[in-house]
Amino acid sequence: MNYRLAYSIGFHPWEDAACDQPFSEKISEMFGREENAREPPHGSALDVGTGSGIWGIELAKRGWQVTGIDIIEKALRRGRERAHDAGVDIRFVHGDVTTLEQTDIGGPFRLVLDTGTFHDFDERQRKAMGRGVSAVASSDATVLLLVWPKRRRPLIRGASRNEVAAAFPDWEITHVEPSHFRLPKPLDLLLRPDEHWYRLRRITHTPASPSCGGDARQRLGSAVGRRSDREGRGRGAVRGIGEP
């Protein structure tokens, strides 16, 4: 989708998601899961493709320190106005989400949110975004990714689970859940979004215990073998004393 054109003509139905109660309740539930009943502040959050900042503002209200990035300056201006009206402080950055590691956005971020950018990228862009997110996310970070399934439709490409996994090779998909969002009926029938939330967590690599590793077993086997050899040579020497 050409988002620059869409904003220039005032076409941004995704902003209506904030008025969709089932969707709003679901995203609020997901935010609550990451907050884990802790008192704010909750840490740094990055809103990727923030647009006019609807969900970044919601995160800021909940006690997150939010940075929003988008390539559409008109959307960012709307976001700054919305944040001012809501009385929250959000840092809005003009930049390309496929070059996050080259953009001065700060970090590391404990939460990365994308409510509809990734799934309209081609393979190269998806992998570039995945690398950038990995570069700016903290070691204990969570990614919440809103994705339309891959199918033939106008406007939005969509992405499959395998494509999500390929773009984030150092992350584990822990949850895939319906978003409960519905477009107005004509658009819903045309686009068939059937969107889902993907929750990803960094893969942690635990070193093998030395006492259980193959090298340790090999060293133990060698030591036992050497001891047996010594004992065998000793017994042979004793027997040889009485021989003619």
Model-derived features with residue positions:
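Σ70-family region 2.3-2.4 aromatic/basic alpha-helix that recognizes the −10 promoter
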Residues: 110
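Class I (Rossmann-like) S-adenosyl-L-methionine-dependent methyltransferase catalytic domain
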Residues: 1-46, 52-107, 121-136, 141-244
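A conserved beta-strand element that flanks and buttresses the S-adenosyl-L-methionine
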Residues: 113
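Short catalytic micro-motifs in class I SAM-dependent methyltransferases
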Residues: 116-120
